[in-house]
Amino acid sequence: MTSLREMFDVVVIGGGHAGTEAAAAAARMGARTALLTHRRDRIGEMSCNPAIGGIGKGHLVREIDALDGVMGRAADAACIHFKMLNRSKGPAVWGPRAQADRGLYRAAVQALLAAQDGLTILEGEAADLELTADGALAAVITGAGGRIACRAAVLTTGTFLRGVLHFGERTEEGGRVGDAASNALSARLRGLGLALGRLKTGTPARLDRRSIDWEALPEDRGEAEPAPFSLLTGRIANPQISCRISETTPETHAIINANLHRSAVYGGRIDGAGPRYCPSIEDKVVRFAERPRHQVFLEPEGLEDETVYPNGISTSLPEEVQEAFIRTMPGLSRAVLLRPGYAVEYDYVDPRELTHALALKKVPGLFLAGQINGTTGYEEAGAQGLLAGVNAALVAAGRSMVTVRRHEGYIGVLVDDLVTRGVSEPYRMFTSRAEHRLSLRADNADLRLTPRGLDWGCVGPARQAAFAALAAAVATVRDGGAGSEQAAAIVAADRLYEGYLTRQESEIRARAKDDAVLIPPDFDFSVVGGLSAEIRARLERVRPETLGVAGRLEGMTPAALGALFAALRRPRPLAA
């Protein structure tokens, strides 16, 4: 462990998808960065499904890559099955998705971090936070009693905050199988007066590839020419594999229904809300009782790995029940479970405690990213981690923090939704959440965000050169010349949506006027006449940074927004 005299600019707590992006981003910004994690060998672990991207999620990966992040390059290095989802629709909502070899992905992330100058990896548990007399962050205290002094820190604790694993009627503490929970840190956050809640997620059993009757199942092929996520990847080098498709049956549902009382969720042992768009098989059977079957995609977890991920049957039923219902599905009558599925319940911090820079309002110098903010998914976590890491480095250097606005990227949509509306269930990104999705395409992420990254200082020379070449090629195609296939696709999409984009630009300019009206951090909302008690309470709770953010709060009316604008224009009384 680091000595008491050693000082870092930024400490990142947690080595998952948010933590790796935060640590790498802070180090790229020139900050002397430490990544503190329970186990170095688990950095970059894909704890649930072996895939990166999807509808909305793929856009986030492309944006992470445009800002020189890790996820896109690691996904390309590990891709073994690729699909462009939504291809039958317009290019604005195409969703690149890569199934990954878990081992290759983890190795790629660890290699990218090892090659990053200015980044030190430390093993240990963060147990406490030391604050200055003014309430700002001063140091991270480890479970072993070590003190890591820092100017800023990023908490990326995933499902580890007071995490509890549920295997049917059996429970045990942990953030995931094989890793301990972070109980002391959760207690510390409560002690800081932060609003914490409880959420849950789950994962299915893992199956032995050798016990599956593959020939009895229809094949699910990927695309012959997988498209890389990263601008820095020439082509995907890995062999591409096929998946297979099974399905639940009426017999499957009968077994599940007969054992619902033994499920951790339906047995009343879990209080936290689960992800609406990734329900457990118990939820599917109960909520969609009229459906006799549900598809299950059998996804190999690696080229040399005998483990198979059965996508679609996340569960918290006891292991023997899981084995029984799985063996009622086509091709799985002799299936062997390598590990049972389980649910994990964990603490999260109400994201309305944060600014748009992902900084805690109550603790200067402390940032939060990932599932601790109420999101679900690797991609959502990585996007938050990158932004938080950039801002932690800026704070450590005494510079102003930065944000991404809704019309600039899905990262901006994600953060704005979190900090203005909060969450009551794990938040997942979809293209439908972005009102400017025609211009926020996966194909143009580099053109949208790499210039921002260059201004911030988080983009390295290799990406800068690749971006310059892409921008030049796009300009050539727009002028009628010949360019790369990638540049031609970007220009074609722009022309397809040209009329809509022109109209959208005027809407963005109008919204920018509200976003330019700042609300002082200590503004007294009680002086604003005409506000309902509900709206006033929500303003006090969220304390929006601008008039534009206030206008996006749930329940805000045009009349209330006008009253707030009028109050902001009045001169503020001088302090006595």
Curated annotation (Swiss-Prot):
The keyword Membrane does not apply. The keyword Transferase does not apply. NAD-binding protein involved in the addition of a carboxymethylaminomethyl (cmnm) group at the wobble position (U34) of certain tRNAs, forming tRNA-cmnm(5)s(2)U34. This is tRNA uridine 5-carboxymethylaminomethyl modification enzyme MnmG. It comes from Acidiphilium cryptum (strain JF-5). GO terms for biological process: tRNA methylation; tRNA wobble uridine modification. It is found in: Cytoplasm. FAD binds at G14, G15, G16, H17, A18, G19. The gene is mnmG.
